[in-house]
């Protein structure tokens, strides 16, 4: 069953004082929006972008911006921490196969990061809908695109 962030309760959801380095990274993202919503872009067509995120224990993917309708699926579950654009910090437990869908109207977006708090790798697949989204996709660098073996 798909859930939105609002439907799933966080294990913790608090307003915290972020470290200076995190604040600086967030400010840089605001100046230059980061459309890399995953670690690696596996596939891209005129309709979809398919990403993977693989985080080792303690590893973090930096602040990035969601502007397109999308869904993600947790491949193997785990525990993660996100710093959200409203200044809150949330922690979630994810279960294998958990899937969430999010949509954005014209001009709407979400900025957040994700850190693996668990003892095992945390893996997600994210699929962005280019076609049917109210916003245009953000540019992404070639360095995140899957390289053929």
PLM regions and their residue ranges:
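A short, N-terminal "cap"/entry segment at the start of jelly-roll beta-barrel domains
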Residues: 2-52, 82-84, 89-111, 115, ...
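Glycine- and acidic-residue-biased ligand/ion/polar-headgroup-sensing regions
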Residues: 66-86
């Amino acid at each position: 069953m798909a859930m939105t962030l609002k439907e799933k309760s966080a294990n913790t959801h608090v307003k915290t004082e972020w470290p200076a380095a995190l604040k600086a990274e967030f400010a840089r993202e605001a100046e230059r929006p980061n459309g890399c919503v995953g670690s690696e872009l596996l596939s891209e067509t005129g309709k979809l972008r398919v990403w993977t995120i693989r985080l080792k224990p303690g590893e973090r993917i930096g602040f990035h911006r969601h502007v397109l309708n999308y869904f993600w699926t947790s491949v193997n579950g785990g525990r993660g921490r996100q710093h959200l654009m409203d200044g809150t910090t949330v922690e979630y437990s994810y279960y294998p196969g958990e899937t969430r869908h999010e949509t954005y109207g014209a001009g709407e977006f979400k900025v957040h990061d994700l850190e693996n708090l668990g003892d095992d790798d945390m893996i997600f697949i994210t699929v962005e809908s280019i076609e049917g989204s109210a916003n245009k996709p953000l540019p992404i660098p070639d360095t995140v695109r899957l390289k053929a073996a």
